[in-house]
Amino acid sequence: VLNAGDKANVKAVWNKVAAHVEEYGAETLERMFTVYPQTKTYFPHFDLHHGSAQIRTHGKKVLTALGEAVNHIDDLASALSKLSDIHAQTLRVDPVNFKFLNHCFLVVVAIHQPSVLTPEVHVSLDKFLSAVGTVLTSKYR
């Protein structure tokens, strides 16, 4: 459960990330595809090479959705309901992939915003990303 301090920490990190959603999103996906190559199976139609327009576009889409979650941090279930439906019922993404994505995003934030990602902020961001993953997998059967 996110407490008031966690929410403030997540919003503070997001203020630094928001201006870089395409760059950080693409880097997060590229890192995930490299470290967890099995995740590529969900993107058979994508050019998965470094810097591809499709990865940049999808990375931006992923982090824009994450930004919406930050903006609705007190009601993640409503904010992510449509995404949860799509990932569970249409795309049928294995829930473990959200953990992979979350880990890769944390690494990207640590690389680009090391002064912001204190141990306390790291914990808050990890809790937030876990909460997002829980909501996104809530409609799986």
Curated annotation (Swiss-Prot):
<dbReference type="GO" id="GO:0005344">
    <property type="term" value="F:oxygen carrier activity"/>
</dbReference>
<keyword id="KW-0561">Oxygen transport</keyword>
<dbReference type="GO" id="GO:0019825">
    <property type="term" value="F:oxygen binding"/>
</dbReference>
<feature type="domain" description="Globin">
    <location>
        <begin position="1"/>
        <end position="141"/>
    </location>
</feature>
<dbReference type="GO" id="GO:0031838">
    <property type="term" value="C:haptoglobin-hemoglobin complex"/>
</dbReference>
<dbReference type="GO" id="GO:0043177">
    <property type="term" value="F:organic acid binding"/>
</dbReference>
<dbReference type="GO" id="GO:0005833">
    <property type="term" value="C:hemoglobin complex"/>
</dbReference>
<dbReference type="InterPro" id="IPR012292">
    <property type="entry name" value="Globin/Proto"/>
</dbReference>
<comment type="function">
    <text>Involved in oxygen transport from the lung to the various peripheral tissues.</text>
</comment>
<dbReference type="InterPro" id="IPR009050">
    <property type="entry name" value="Globin-like_sf"/>
</dbReference>
<dbReference type="Pfam" id="PF00042">
    <property type="entry name" value="Globin"/>
</dbReference>
<dbReference type="GO" id="GO:0042744">
    <property type="term" value="P:hydrogen peroxide catabolic process"/>
</dbReference>
<keyword id="KW-0479">Metal-binding</keyword>
<comment type="subunit">
    <text>Heterotetramer of two alpha chains and two beta chains.</text>
</comment>
<keyword id="KW-0408">Iron</keyword>
<protein>
    <recommendedName>
        <fullName>Hemoglobin subunit alpha-A</fullName>
    </recommendedName>
</protein>
<dbReference type="GO" id="GO:0072562">
    <property type="term" value="C:blood microparticle"/>
</dbReference>
<comment type="similarity">
    <text>Belongs to the globin family.</text>
</comment>
<dbReference type="InterPro" id="IPR050056">
    <property type="entry name" value="Hemoglobin_oxygen_transport"/>
</dbReference>
<dbReference type="GO" id="GO:0005506">
    <property type="term" value="F:iron ion binding"/>
</dbReference>
<keyword id="KW-0349">Heme</keyword>
<dbReference type="GO" id="GO:0004601">
    <property type="term" value="F:peroxidase activity"/>
</dbReference>
<dbReference type="GO" id="GO:0031720">
    <property type="term" value="F:haptoglobin binding"/>
</dbReference>
<dbReference type="GO" id="GO:0020037">
    <property type="term" value="F:heme binding"/>
</dbReference>
<dbReference type="InterPro" id="IPR002339">
    <property type="entry name" value="Hemoglobin_pi"/>
</dbReference>
<keyword id="KW-0813">Transport</keyword>
<feature type="binding site">
    <location>
        <position position="58"/>
    </location>
    <ligand>
        <name>O2</name>
    </ligand>
</feature>
<dbReference type="InterPro" id="IPR002338">
    <property type="entry name" value="Hemoglobin_a-typ"/>
</dbReference>
<dbReference type="InterPro" id="IPR000971">
    <property type="entry name" value="Globin"/>
</dbReference>
<feature type="binding site" description="proximal binding residue">
    <location>
        <position position="87"/>
    </location>
    <ligand>
        <name>heme b</name>
    </ligand>
</feature>
